[in-house]
């Protein structure tokens, strides 16, 4: 039979849960060597998967006539959860996510990376988070790490994402968006919550706010944001990063290039 009915989404997540539980049962508590899995790696992945499953169960929606979630031949719900099942399923998956994460925490094997962290010191907190991603020497926060070694096991992440300052062959492929930056504290804002860049009540009103240095705009930004995003004028790998989106030279009011200047 080449037309075996697909399992429902709930059945699929239940199988994922069972597979993780079996892996947790069979695996050792410690990795035999760096880069290998162990019981707590499986628990961490299980927690992440069950958090996603619980979110799908609780928040999924269907669009009538466009996305029903039901197979046309079998009527099996292959997308989302039935109305009489989502509450129970989401509670089950969220509980499994919590239990798995709690077991990892209570094991004492892993902990937050705080080698350079210091209370009330934004610069130390920023540097601590930067180092967290590159310090592989006894980093207590690393649960599972995929290691790369030149020339046998490499990646092209830097080539695709480095700023133009470094003249990488494929750089600037990924840039953070303004709405991502808006998720963090430390900025002046318009009444609607967006980042304030002019003297008016919106980005289409008033004059641009002027700074002596591009970094002045970010001086109060959360340390973790600075660790995630390279700001114009910040120093990265020993170089000052120049990022421009045009140069404003006059005192004239803002004149949008397009009819809608918002982002």
Question: What is each residue range found by the language model?
Answer:
Residues 1-5, 25:
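N-terminal cofactor/phosphate-binding cores enriched in small/glycine residues
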Residues 1, 35, 42-44, 49:
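The tetratricopeptide repeat
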Residues 25-35:
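Flexible helix-coil transition and linker loops at the boundaries of alpha-helical arrays
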Residues 5, 31, 86:
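Generic anion/oxyanion-binding catalytic loop in active/binding sites
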Residues 254-263:
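Active-site-adjacent "gating/activation" loops or surface patches in catalytic cores
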Residues 1, 15, 19:
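Mobile, glycine-rich extracellular loop/lid and propeptide segments
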Residues 13, 21, 40, 48-254:
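An aromatic- and glycine-enriched ligand-binding surface/loop that stacks and positions planar moieties
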């Amino acid at each position: 039979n080449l037309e075996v009915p697909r399992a429902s989404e709930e059945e699929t997540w239940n199988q994922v849960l069972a597979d993780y539980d079996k892996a947790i049962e069979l695996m050792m508590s410690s990795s035999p060597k760096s880069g290998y899995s162990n019981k707590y790696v499986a628990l961490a992945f299980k927690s992440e998967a069950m958090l996603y499953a619980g979110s799908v169960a609780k928040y999924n929606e269907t669009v009538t006539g466009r996305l029903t979630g039901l197979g046309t031949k079998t009527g099996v719900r292959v997308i989302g959860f039935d109305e009489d099942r989502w509450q129970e399923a989401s509670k089950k998956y969220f509980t499994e996510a919590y239990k798995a994460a709690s077991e990892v925490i209570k094991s004492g094997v892993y902990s937050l990376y705080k080698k350079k962290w210091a209370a009330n010191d934004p610069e130390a907190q920023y540097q601590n988070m930067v180092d967290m991603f590159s310090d592989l020497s006894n980093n207590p926060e690393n649960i599972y790490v995929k290691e790369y070694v030149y020339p046998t096991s490499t990646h092209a992440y830097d080539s695709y994402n480095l700023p133009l300052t470094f003249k990488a062959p494929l750089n600037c492929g990924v840039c953070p968006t303004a709405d991502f930056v808006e998720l963090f504290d430390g900025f002046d804002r318009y009444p609607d919550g967006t980042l304030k860049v002019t003297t008016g009540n919106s980005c289409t009103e008033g004059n641009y706010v002027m700074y002596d240095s591009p970094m002045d705009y970010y001086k109060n930004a959360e340390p973790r944001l600075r660790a995630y995003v390279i700001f114009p004028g910040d120093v990265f790998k020993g170089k000052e990063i120049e990022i421009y989106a045009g140069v404003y030279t006059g005192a004239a009011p803002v004149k949008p290039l397009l009819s809608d200047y918002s982002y």
